[in-house]
């Protein structure tokens, strides 16, 4: 069964965590593409930015960054900065150690705020 605005409303508005997670996950798992899932997740009258974010995260994990439509990214302000931060975040679990390693030094050079 595909999510529709009416069916989504039966789960709630997404204003609390369990509703937002249910809506985002349902939209992600029932979609044939990242675009379809995110659009479904935001086309309801509830907390659509949160449900869209959740669906987008799951769909990005499943399909990778190349699944994001180019027209969503092409004119995105600070695209290069966002992409660099995303890459750095992806390195943290495996490559970052606070032991002075090369990855650690590179992170501290880019984000020296501490």
Question: Each predicted region: which residue ranges?
Answer:
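Structural motif
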Residues: 11-18
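Small-residue-rich helix-loop
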Residues: 1-11
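Juxtamembrane cytosolic face of transmembrane helices
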Residues: 109-114
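Catalytic phosphate/nucleotide-handling subdomain of diverse soluble enzymes
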Residues: 19, 23-108
């Amino acid at each position: 069964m595909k999510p529709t605005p009416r069916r989504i409303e039966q789960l709630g508005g997404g204003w609390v965590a369990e509703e937002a997670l249910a809506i985002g996950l349902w939209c992600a798992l029932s979609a044939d593409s990242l675009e379809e899932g995110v659009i479904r997740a935001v086309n309801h009258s509830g907390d659509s930015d949160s449900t869209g974010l959740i669906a987008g995260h799951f769909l990005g994990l499943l399909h990778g960054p190349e699944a994001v439509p180019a027209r969503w990214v092409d004119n995105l302000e600070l695209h290069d900065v966002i992409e660099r931060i995303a890459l750095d975040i992806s390195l943290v679990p495996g490559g970052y150690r606070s032991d002075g390693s090369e990855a650690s030094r590179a992170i501290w050079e880019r984000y020296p705020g501490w």
